[in-house]
A protein has these predicted regions:
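Short, Lys/Arg-enriched segments at the junction into DNA-binding effector domains
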Residues: 7-8, 120-148
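Charged docking surfaces used in two-component/phosphorelay signaling
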Residues: 20-28
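Acidic, metal-coordinating helix/loop segments flanking the phosphotransfer/catalytic sites
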Residues: 36-54
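Acidic catalytic/metal-coordinating carboxylates
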Residues: 39, 65-68
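Short amphipathic alpha-helix used as the core "switch/output" element in two-component signaling
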Residues: 45, 67-78
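Active-site residues of response regulator receiver
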Residues: 58, 85
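The feature encodes the CheY-like receiver
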Residues: 62, 89, 107
């Protein structure tokens, strides 16, 4: 990811209208790659094919739920995840965050708020990637390239 706008975003929701609305707004905001999936199986396939930099996940999906999907994908990657769900109970939010989600936004939502949260998560991931890329490890020796 050269900039946050080069990031690949995976959007998972079973509502085709919401997929279109959010995808259009992400692209209008400058994000170049938005992959969509309407169920867990398609999401796993898209994740494997595109290796996204951010996931936006619904919870209620036709072939499972976003909680289980996140649990599965977390075994492969620590990509930032944001739940976008109509489930607004405190227990759901806490459970999702406890699984490792980085954020949780309930529907209905303000599009500008979603875009700001996406921007924040991608900026944080980008900064982390930059820090990692500036550390070189060879065997037992680690060199911080920022100090070199």
């Amino acid at each position: 990811m050269t900039t946050i706008y080069d990031a690949a975003i995976l959007l998972v929701d079973d509502n085709p209208d919401l997929l279109t609305l959010v995808t259009d707004n992400l692209r209008t905001a400058g994000y170049k790659t938005v992959c969509t999936a309407a169920d867990c199986a398609a999401a796993r396939a898209a994740f494997a094919a595109h290796r996204p930099d951010l996931m936006i996940l619904d919870i209620n999906l036709p072939d499972g739920d976003g909680f289980g999907l996140l649990r599965t994908l977390r075994t492969e990657s620590d990509v930032p995840a944001l739940f976008l769900s109509a489930r607004d109970a405190d227990a759901d939010r806490l459970f999702g965050l406890g699984l490792g989600a980085d954020d949780y936004l309930t529907k209905p939502f303000l599009m500008q708020e979603l875009l700001l949260r996406v921007q924040h998560l991608l900026q944080r991931a980008y900064r982390t990637e930059l820090r990692r890329s500036r550390v070189l490890t060879l065997g037992d020796c680690t060199v911080n390239l920022q100090d070199a």
